[in-house]
From Swiss-Prot:
Belongs to the class-II aminoacyl-tRNA synthetase family. GO terms for biological process: alanyl-tRNA aminoacylation. GO terms for cellular component: cytosol. SUPFAM superfamilies: Class II aaRS and biotin synthetases, Putative anticodon-binding domain of alanyl-tRNA synthetase (AlaRS), ThrRS/AlaRS common domain, Translation proteins. The lineage of its organism: Bacteria, Bacillati, Actinomycetota, Actinomycetes, Mycobacteriales. Catalyzes the attachment of alanine to tRNA(Ala) in a two-step reaction: alanine is first activated by ATP to form Ala-AMP and then transferred to the acceptor end of tRNA(Ala). Also edits incorrectly charged Ser-tRNA(Ala) and Gly-tRNA(Ala) via its editing domain. This is Alanine--tRNA ligase. It is found in: Cytoplasm. Its cofactor is Zn(2+). Zn(2+) binds at residues 571, 575, 674, 678.
Length: 888
């Protein structure tokens, strides 16, 4: 039975029994504590916690999930997958244990002709919580399961809770017996290789208290309603129903392994270490595609780092299996074919998915080549010196300079029977992060614990009136000073104010929050920011400038209209830029993020290549043409399904409610799901000036622009610059490019002439320089600062010339210079010196350590660059010391 059919039978079974079918949520939820959705119940969590009222009594879903905690175990065993699908049925006070058990048993054991999955009931076992007599009795009486196939296990195995005070309850797990070929008899309590868990039924009926020092907790009460949460692993059931040994042999993953065989020329099933790599490729390819589908792009932090790590593990595994060229497009293409029947949205987003994957592969292949050279160089040194540990500094250099994740360095080290000084690596990483933190202002945010807002979230959500008004009255429901609830806030204090209603827009959707003022009967405050808490409460960050504000007062909330107007211009301008981008670049240019503040916009989008100047001009012209056309801007409140049917664009990875807001500019020109504040007509945006574009990550570009008066001022500054250039060149504005080209050509010719003269001068001096070499234990040692203005190329030429002049004498040289802010340096050693242990690479490292740089190369010739010219003398002395130590 194909996986898609298993999914369909599951859904049909529960829909027929009255459950509401709920589509899978995105893998990315608006939860800072959750990297990815990792369980089927996660999207229903607010209902189970009582934070929201479910719009249905029972539901069923097949949820996309990603778990990356055991990413290093993938492939080593056949059990671990980073991406999986969790089929579940949920009841919110409608049915309990009897309904859950009956539903599961019926679907699993009914014949295929009757809509079931056709499992042999004689092969099914269950476990229940050791004290759950009711569940054990139901399994026996309701479905006829023999008592010997009902096993009781303890709290660790069969009791569900979230690790914190809240709902909890016993659970019951269903297992399938694969037969004696897979292990000994005795049920799941004895052998979890033979007995495979396929379904977990959680009976939520109690509320637990705080965790005690010994790890236990008390049951403090019953839940108002008894709930059901179940989860069935689709992939596990698929390999059982398809008659194969594990998930990697199913219709979802085996085709990816087949493609990998063709790409690498290696056969699966011949060597264990190769099989591990094949499974890594299959698992990670599927997960990477599903993450990109939901809007994740490769990066160096968080979700982006996970995706980057997966793609890089795919590429390296493929190369270790023998792949020579690119592999990502073909691997993702195979995943596309396997997954599209269940996720048709893959097809419409394929070009974007392909582009992100291929772009990351190109970048990593360059990284892999340069980083591998450095690692191989260290391996040679390690073998010579007998060390078994990769120093933290080497791992940090691979990460910082070549983009090697620490796990990749660890894998490469393990393959060479080495370990990595990860403590040293993390210490250097921490130092780097501390420096970065000191150099940048901390992002402002609401600095109170979320519990402070709990009462307002549950009972007093803020009513936003800002779509219609820029001024309104609001009652003070809460004041927070220094992270604690307070009765009042006085002049000079910074605080947060929660009102029952407000015209202030809270930062969201890329749009900065409004600024303005709050005035009460006894005080005045400046609003410096507004943050949305749990999507329900507006926290106004204020500075009290006069008197005081107090709980219960009625305040006049007034938005700074100039700020609001310019923010609206920027946000509407972003929509025009987005539409223009898609017109010029095609539908693969999909939004990856944005930021709008008064007069300025920044728009990130998925695209693999740098934009040309011509493309930027086209985008700017299309956007300004839309401004000139004076399109009407309409907002429409509608259902998510209707919005999609209208053609409204949604942000990938964003989770929308059933009701959404559509912003339409000029009918078909631009239509997006958006909760921001916009102009009424496109002409109100004013001129849009595109500043340029840049890369912000693998496969992600950023375009920046000014709007309104900021755009006008930018254009005026450009005009003034052109006028000054024209005056200096005594030319018209049209002639300036030609004059600059001519001047540049003259400058390059002069620089070339200077370099030639300098090279001739140095060549004439090499003889006298060589004569100044010192003799150390029969070795000619020459270290010298050759002054300013020499680059690596010139230093290399002098070093090679000098070393040649020593003829049969053993000799090493190191030369340095100051080239602007850089300190280039080159070392050379002739064969006789290398034989005595004097290697150019070692000299370069010793010198580089003193000038804030690093370098590398071969034993005969190496070079590097530093940034601290004050350390040149110390560097030359360090080289002398190293030579003395080696020769002593």
């Amino acid at each position: 039975m194909q996986t898609h059919e298993i999914r369909q039978r599951f859904t049909d079974h529960f829909v027929k029994s009255g459950h509401t079918e709920v589509p899978s949520a995105s893998l990315i939820l608006d939860d800072p504590n959750l990297l990815f959705v990792n369980a089927g119940m996660v999207p229903f969590k607010p209902y189970f916690l009582g934070q929201e009222t479910p719009p249905f009594g029972t539901a069923t879903s097949i949820q996309k999930c990603v778990r990356t905690l055991d990413i290093d175990e993938v492939g080593i065993t056949t059990r671990h997958n980073t991406f999986f699908q969790m089929a579940g049925n949920f009841s919110f006070g409608q049915y309990f244990k009897e309904g859950a058990i009956k539903n599961a048993w019926t679907l699993l054991t009914n014949s295929v002709d009757d809509g079931g999955l056709g499992l042999n009931p004689d092969r099914l076992w269950v476990t229940v919580y050791e004290d759950d007599d009711e569940a054990a009795q139901l399994w026996h009486d309701l479905v006829g399961l023999p008592t010997e196939r009902i096993q009781r296990l303890g709290m660790e195995d069969n009791y569900w809770h979230m690790g914190v005070p809240g709902p909890c309850g016993p659970c019951s797990e269903i297992y399938y017996d694969r037969g004696p070929a897979y292990g000994e008899d005795g049920g799941p309590a004895v052998d979890d290789s033979r007995f495979i868990e396929i379904w977990n039924l959680v009976f939520m009926e109690f509320e637990r208290g705080e965790t005690k020092p010994d790890g236990s907790f008390d049951i403090v009460g019953n839940l108002p309603k008894k709930n059901i949460d179940t989860g069935m692993g689709v992939e596990r059931l698929a390999f059982l129903l398809q008659g194969v040994d594990n998930v990697y042999e199913t219709d979802l993953l085996r085709p990816v392994i087949d493609t990998a065989e063709k790409l690498t020329g290696t056969r699966y099933g011949t060597q264990d270490k190769d099989d591990i790599r094949f499974r890594v490729i299959a698992d990670h390819s599927r997960t990477a595609l599903m993450l990109i589908l939901d809007g994740v792009t490769p990066g160096n932090e968080g979700r982006g780092y996970i995706l980057r790590r997966l793609i890089r593990r795919i590429i390296r595994s493929a190369r270790l299996l023998g792949a020579q060229g690119a592999v990502i497009e073909q691997l993702l293409g195979t995943v596309r074919e396997a997954m599209t029947p269940s996720y048709p949205e893959i097809e419409e987003n394929w070009e974007r998915i392909r582009s992100v994957g291929v772009t990351e592969e190109k970048a990593f292949l360059k990284t892999l080549e340069s980083g591998s050279q450095l690692f191989e160089q260290f391996l040679t040194e390690a073998r010579n010196s007998g060390t078994s540990v990769v120093p933290g500094a080497v791992a940090f250099s691979l990460h910082d300079t070549h983009g090697f994740p620490i796990d990749l360095t660890r894998e490469m080290a393990e393959e060479a029977s080495l370990t990595v000084d990860e403590a040293g690596f993390h210490e250097l990483m921490a130092e780097q992060k501390a420096r970065a933190k000191a150099d940048s202002a901390a992002k402002k945010h609401v600095h109170a614990d979320l519990s402070v807002y709990r009462a307002f979230i549950d009972s007093h959500p803020t009513h936003f009136t800002g779509y219609e008004n820029t001024a309104d009255e609001g009652k003070v429901l809460g004041l927070i000073v220094d992270g604690q609830l307070a009765d009042r806030a006085s002049a000079g204090q910074h605080a947060q104010v929660i009102l029952d209603q407000t015209p202030f827009y809270a930062e969201s959707g890329g749009q900065m929050a409004d600024r303005g003022s709050l005035r009460g009967p006894g005080g005045l405050a400046k609003v410096v920011d507004v943050q949305k808490i749990a999507k329900k409460v507006w926290a106004h960050l204020i500075e009290v400038t006069e008197g005081e504000l107090a709980i219960g007062e009625l305040l006049e909330a007034r938005v700074d209209q100039k700020w609001r107007h310019q923010a609206r211009q920027a946000h509407s301008g972003t929509h025009l830029i987005h539409a223009a981008l898609r017109e010029v670049l095609g539908p693969t240019a999909v939004q990856a993020g944005s930021m709008n503040k008064p007069g300025y916009l920044r728009f990130d989008f998925s695209y693999g290549d740098q934009l040309t100047e011509k493309q930027l001009q086209q985008i700017e012209e299309i956007a300004n043409s839309a401004v000139d056309t004076d399109y009407q801007v309409n907002t429409i409140e509608t259902s998510l399904e209707e919005a999609k049917a209208m053609g409204a664009m949604a942000l990938f990875g964003e989770n929308y409610g059933k009701q959404v807001r559509v912003v339409e500019i000029g009918g078909p020109f631009s239509m997006e799901l958006c909760g921001g504040i916009h102009v009424d007509h496109s002409s109100q945006i004013g001129p849009i000036s595109v500043l340029g574009e840049s890369s912000v990550g693998s496969g992600v570009r950023r375009i920046e622009a000014y709007t309104g008066m900021d755009s006008f001022r930018h254009l005026a500054a450009d005009r003034s610059l052109v006028a000054n250039l024209a005056a200096n060149f005594k030319a018209t504005s049209e002639e300036i490019p030609e004059r600059i080209d001519a001047l540049t050509a003259k400058l390059k010719a002069a620089e070339k002439q200077v370099q030639q003269l300098r090279a001739q001068q140095l060549a004439a001096q090499v003889g006298s320089i060589v004569d100044s070499a010192a003799d150390v234990s029969g070795v000619k040692v020459l270290t010298q600062n050759l002054g300013e203005g020499l680059g690596a190329k010139e230093l290399r030429s002098v070093a090679q010339d000098a070393i040649a002049r020593f003829n049969s004498e053993t000799a090493v040289v190191l030369f340095t210079s100051q080239d602007g802010e850089k300190v280039p340096f080159v070392a050379a050693a002739n064969p006789q010196a290398v034989e005595r242990g004097l290697k150019a690479g070692d000299l370069v490292k010793a010198f580089g350590a003193e000038v804030g740089g690093r370098g590398g190369g071969k034993p005969a010739l190496a070079q590097g660059s530093g940034s601290d010219a004050s350390g040149v003398d110390a560097g030359l002395a360090a080289v002398q010391r190293l030579v003395n130590e080696i020769l002593s």
